[in-house]
């Protein structure tokens, strides 16, 4: 039996440690990574992928996938406890640690201000940004249909993120401070990693690596061809 009251208390305690201003060891990062977590075998296996990209070229330079036994069932509002063990396993495999990490999920845009981007950022002490595809909490004014339309995401009088339309005719992204990155900088860095898709390149590639999508298959073929040439 999962003690959600204990987990809730831990979330609140950890959330108080999140650094919400810029505490960045760079003027421009050399490497930005994306992280994505999924589940296999009816949820019994956690699959975590991290894709590291050189910045600003956004060239994929390293990726790692970790598969571990899932340690916790799905409980709404406590997803980071389920996802962080897999992310830690993938992180440990990386040879090139990134200067900045985008996580597919929420940062402080969480009812208790501890989404997976914030939780993981605290665990590894790296600047993180939450890039979520759906809203978990908070309210925002309607966006226009124009690319670049944005509104603050507000909850209980506090800005907890940005709602930003990254691509025409697509639902907006929910971008938020994870750890050691301010709200405005979080949006800036996500915007700087766009290449015409709905998702920024780091999390788009993390998803591609995790799911063996065509873009990643083509990249692997090109790498193999480069070795042979």
From Swiss-Prot:
Cofactor(s) needed for function: Mg(2+)
Localisation per UniProt entry: Cytoplasm
Presence of the UniProt keyword rRNA processing in the record: no
Cited InterPro entries: Endonuclease-V (IPR007581)
Catalytic activity: Endonucleolytic cleavage at apurinic or apyrimidinic sites to products with a 5'-phosphate
Gene Ontology BP terms: DNA repair
Assigned GO CC terms: cytoplasm
Positions of Mg(2+) binding: 36, 104
Primary location group: cytoplasm
Source taxon at top rank: Bacteria
One Gene Ontology term of the molecular function aspect: magnesium ion binding
Entry keyword DNA repair: yes
Record keywords: Cytoplasm, DNA damage, DNA repair, Endonuclease, Hydrolase, Magnesium, Metal-binding, Nuclease
Site (Interaction with target DNA): 74
EC number: 3.1.21.7
NCBIfam families for the chain: PRK11617.1
Family under the similarity heading: Belongs to the endonuclease V family.
Function recorded in the entry: DNA repair enzyme involved in the repair of deaminated bases. Selectively cleaves double-stranded DNA at the second phosphodiester bond 3' to a deoxyinosine leaving behind the intact lesion on the nicked DNA.
Protein name listed in UniProt: Endonuclease V
Organism: Pectobacterium carotovorum subsp. carotovorum (strain PC1)
Record gene name: nfi
């Amino acid at each position: 039996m999962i003690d959600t009251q204990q987990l809730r208390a831990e979330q609140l305690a950890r959330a108080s440690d999140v650094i919400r201003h810029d505490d960045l060891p760079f003027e421009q990062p050399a490497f930005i990574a994306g992280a994505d977590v999924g589940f296999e075998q009816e949820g019994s296996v956690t699959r975590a992928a991290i894709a590291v990209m050189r910045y600003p070229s956004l060239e994929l330079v390293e990726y790692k996938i970790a598969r571990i036994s899932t340690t916790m069932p799905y409980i709404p509002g406590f997803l980071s406890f389920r996802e962080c063990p897999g992310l830690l396993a993938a992180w440990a495999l990386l040879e090139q640690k990134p200067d900045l990490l985008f996580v597919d999920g929420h940062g402080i845009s969480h009812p208790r201000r501890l989404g997976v981007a914030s939780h993981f950022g605290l665990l590894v002490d790296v600047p993180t940004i939450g890039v979520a595809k759906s809203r978990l909490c908070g309210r925002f004014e309607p966006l226009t249909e124009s690319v670049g339309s944005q509104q603050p995401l507000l909850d209980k009088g506090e800005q907890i993120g940005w709602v930003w339309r990254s691509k025409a005719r697509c639902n907006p992204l929910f971008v938020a401070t994870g750890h050691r990155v301010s709200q405005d900088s979080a949006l800036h860095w996500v915007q700087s990693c766009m290449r015409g898709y709905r998702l920024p390149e780091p999390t788009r590639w993390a998803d591609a690596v995790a799911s063996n999508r065509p873009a990643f298959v083509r990249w692997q073929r090109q790498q193999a061809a480069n070795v042979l040439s």
